Every structure is written in structure tokens, then in C-alpha cells.
Curated annotation (Swiss-Prot):
Keywords: ATP-binding, Cytoplasm, Ligase, Nucleotide-binding, Purine biosynthesis. The gene is purM. GO terms for biological process: 'de novo' IMP biosynthetic process; adenine biosynthetic process. One of its GO terms (cellular component) is cytosol. This is Phosphoribosylformylglycinamidine cyclo-ligase.
Amino acid sequence: MAMPKLTYEEAGVNVQEGQRAVNLMKESVKSTFTKGVLGDIGGFGGLFALDPREMEKPILVAGTDGVGTKLKLAFMMNRHDTIGEDCVAMCVNDILCQGAKPLFFLDYIATGKLKAEVVAEIVQGIANGCKKAGCALIGGETAEMPGFYQKGEYDVAGFTVGMVEEKNLITGKEISQGDIMIGISSSGVHSNGFSLVRKLFFEDKQYSVDQYVDGLGETLGEALLRPTKIYVKPILEVLQQEKIKGMVHVTGGGFYENIPRILPEGIDANVHLDTWQAPPIFQFIQQEGQIEQDEMFSTFNMGIGMIVVVERSAGEKVVQLLQELGEEASIIGEMVRGSKQVVLCQK
């Protein structure tokens, strides 16, 4: 008896559904295109033309990241239109810390069974993030991998390249005693600490994502899924007017792991806890989980998504500039003699 002929679709890969996803996302992708983009959607590689007249000695800065287990929350809520924005934010905010202006972005989406509408929603979020960052979405990969992911789940990762003038590269090496830290508010939990959050709320406490929380003024799911803020445009505007010595994207590891990444030898960062109040979502997490302060600051951004370090004399002006650009910003600490430690203290 002849064996039935096997097809790729019978093995779990639907090429037609993949093409339908491409068709659904085309307009979103094209809406991000900037003057440097060459070619159209569907090429083997994304093309981007650098303008050599823009900088004397341009340095390319690259970054890659994902969204982590915040994706699980998107699955629980069956909402996929913001998680792509998180992915862009995690990448572009990182390269921004070295003064780089993002030029272009590529994405990677992998799932067990491809649903064109879900992929299109994810890409819409990526496109929204790219537009907020002023960069172009020039390529990506959507992988259907049967048997690899749980039903209805997927993973998202991104990659970005930006450019900075060599003399304007920000490394933190110039940070010195007396410099001050300016904290710029986050939009919420951003994209870190979700393994703790999910265990606390949805395993231990048995909350629902649809549960309204009085202290938050919204459902728990809405508060947690809010996209990571993208700081590119306000920071680049500040850099046109003032010198920034160092920048910290407060992500995984919170204050304790991220601030030391820019500290030179012989310097500590004193963070003044009485200069801002952690937003309600962090107070709720700490209260419900009976979590120690150090653990909170080791895990979450605590309401501060980006920190910039400037000379003390420029502090008030930079704060004012950021506020004029629509950001909540304040001086939250200073650099002192030490050994590359982060010290939580009162002003």
C-alpha cells in the first residue's frame, strides 16, 4: 500500500497563513520608513543608507533584547497590540544610553502555530514603538515551529542599530564626585520583574487580570501590561543642548545592577529615596508580597525608567528641559567617593 504524500502544512507549518500575516502587516511596517530605507518589504536583507554628511566620525551602536515573561500576561489577556512596543523600547532605550540615535529595527517572532491576526497585532505594536523612537522597521522573521511552544504562545525579540558621533559617545567615564542623577519617570513596571509579579499575583494570590484594584484605578492586567516608555526623542533633544555624562536604563536587576554599569572607579551613587514616591503599582506589589525594600530596588524600576547623570550646575536646567518635553523628571541623587556601589539613603 502506497504511503500518503506528506505536506509541510500537515507537519504543522502553514505557508499560506504566513503570507497572509505578511500582507496584514505591510502597512504598519511601511509607516515606519525613514529617508534612509532602501527597497521594499520581502527582501532577503533590510537595506538602510547612512548619510556620511551627518557625522564626522560616526559610531554604530547595536542592541538586542526581548520582553521576557511579560509575554505571559499578554497571553492571559489575549491582547497582543502593545507587547511589540515593549520589545522596541527595551532595545532602543539601551543604545540610547550611549548617546545613539536609533536608525533601524528588526524583529523576530516565533510561535508553535501561526495566527496571522495575532502576528499583525504584534507587528503593529513594533511599528508604533519604532515611530516613537524615530527608527525604521526594515526586516524581521516570523517562525512557525510546531511542537516547540505551548498552544497560543509565542516569543518576541528585537535588534536595533543606532549611530552616534564619536566625540559624543556616552560611556560614564567622565562621571565624577558631585555630579547629580536625574530620574525620568517610568510608565509602570515596564518589562522586568514579571516572573516575580506573576508568581505573586496569579499563583500565590490567585488574582485575575480583570480584577479592578481601587488603589490602581484600573484592572491589574491594565496596570501591568502598560508598554515600556521610549525615551529616545526627549533625551536626544536634551543632548542638543546639554552634556550628559552617563545614562542608565533601569531594567532587569533594578538600581543595584544597572547603575554600577556606568560608574567609574572610586565613585558611589547615592540614591535619595525621599525625592520621589514609587507609583501605586510598586506599592501594591511590595504590600501584597511583603517584599523587602532592597529586593524591590533589585528587581523593579520603582517608577524611574531612565537615569541621566549631569554636572550639578546643569541639573535644574536639564530637569526643566525634560519637563517642558512632557516628562516627569527630578533630581534623585548624587555621585560621591566610593567603590562603584549604589547606596539607598535619604537626602
